[in-house]
Amino acid sequence: MQTLQLVILFALFLLTVWLFFLNSRANHPSWAALEHRRYAHRGLHCSADSVPENSLAAFRRAIRHGYGAELDVHLLRDGTLAVFHDSDLKRMTGVTGVLEDCTAQDLAALHLASTPETIPQLCEVLSLYEGTGLPLVVELK
C-alpha cells in the first residue's frame, strides 16, 4: 500500500511540474503575436480548384485571404529545404521514393497531385510571405 501511495505522490509531483512549465510557456509574450490569427494548414489548398497542399499556389491563396500558414520542412540530400508534409513521395506525386533521398533538381521534375505545381523550397515560400506581416509556423520534419 505504501508503494502505491509513493507512486501516486510521484505522479502528482510530475504532473505539477509539467503543468508549471506548460503554463509558463503558454503565457510567454512572444506567443501573443501568433494568437487571434487564421492559419492555413499546408497552405490554403483546395483539390476542387487544383490547388494542392504545400504548393506555392496554396500559399499564394492563403496570403490573398490574409492567412498565415503552417508548413512542414524536410532537409534534402543536397542540403536544400523542401516544403512537403510526407517523407514518402507517393501520395502527392504518384512517384515511389523518399523525399530526403532527393535533390532540389529531382523534385523540380515532380508535379503535385497531377497539377503543374511542384514541391517548393522553403526560400520560395519565405519570399512569398516576406513583407505581408502574416505569420508562418514551420515544422521541421
Describe the function of each predicted region.
Residues Q2-K141:
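Phosphate-group recognition and catalysis centered on beta-loop-alpha active-site segments
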